[in-house]
Amino acid sequence: MADLSVEFSGLRLKNPIIVASAEPSNSVENIRKCIDHGAGAVITKTIGDIPGMRKLTENSKYAILNDKGTLIRGKVPRSFVFYSRSGYVTEPEQDWISYLKETQAYAAAKGSHIIGNITSGTVAGWRGLARMVEDCGIPMLEVNYQCPHPAELAAGAEGVWLAQDPKVTAEVTRQIVDAVGIPVMVKLTPESNRITEIAKAALDAGAASVAVNSRFVGFAVDIDKAEPYIGGPAGVGGPWVKYITQRWVNEIFDRFGCDISGSNGIFDARDAIEFIMSGAKVMQVGSVLMLKGVEWLPKVIEGIDRFLDEHGYPDLAAIHGLASKRALKTPAEMLSMEPLYCEIDRSKCKYPTCDICVRMCFYDSLHFGEDRVVTTPDTCIGCELCYNVCPFDAIRMLPKSERAETLAAE
């Protein structure tokens, strides 16, 4: 059995799976369930001082879509689209003082942790909520910057989400970090083309880690009704988005080597492992728990353990950042990849019943012959598209250098 424990922002977690700030963590009872099912930590649903955002939660709406863009109707696909609109916890922030104390005591007894997720509309509010959470014995904060920026913080910044502007991100983060003694994690938003710059601003201002990322804002359409699902724009995420999220995890890890919590795109253990190899130390799961239940947590955790054992890895550190470290960084490195060409295994090829490889080749390297598919290695650029689409594993990719050596020998 592999060691799944991980050191993250000063906390020792028994495993890297954290329940994200969402409905599964919106009450004492739900948080207890997450802990009972093995979560390394649970992030509370956002505690905030903006009444309108609490009201929004009371009017939450969801549309869970499949690859056709229609409602899943109980059949949860591997790559669902989670389209929803919600807000903060429904209770006033002061009510959560007792909830936080109770859940932290319960978590500690089970070897888990509570992370308090907060947001505010003022500097004083951010600092006050941060202190409130710390005073309850909570060991870590996650700050949710996906809300309008208050006018008092920076002239001309009204209406700007905090995590879209590096200077504003640094300003607010510094205020929060200075107010407490516990580590602060900043949750980034994908609604920015400056995510790496925003991450640096947060880290330079004292953040212990970053969470990559919160959800996009999308617009989903029900074409049969000629109207948007759930009335209009809403948050959109799900497993389909993991490759975009992992792009930023990789980039931030490569640039700064900081502690990263991967979020938005995790369905199962495979996804979690991809995030770890991209550079995340821990992962946040949320939408899948809302569709599969918190009973899904042990499946993810056990799946990670099984993968490590099967591949001979002793612990998470052995795979942390592996893919990121092996990634090509520059166009020059990408152009230096060894040229390949395709070769067809006649014993496996089903031509003329199947001709998909020829139809998919746009470089005139595959042609129809009288009784077989004919390859033209000299024009093959080694893109591997034919290798991907062949349903019979009849195509293999070989180095052009080996072919040149063979021809020379002949």
Residue ranges and their predicted role:
Residues 1-114, 119-124, 409:
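N-terminal capping/small domains of soluble enzymes
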Residues 332-353, 364-382, 396-410:
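Ferredoxin-like iron-sulfur electron-transfer modules
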Residues 289, 302-335:
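Charged C-terminal helix
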Residues 32-37, 41, 109-110, 121-261, ...:
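Alpha/beta enzyme core
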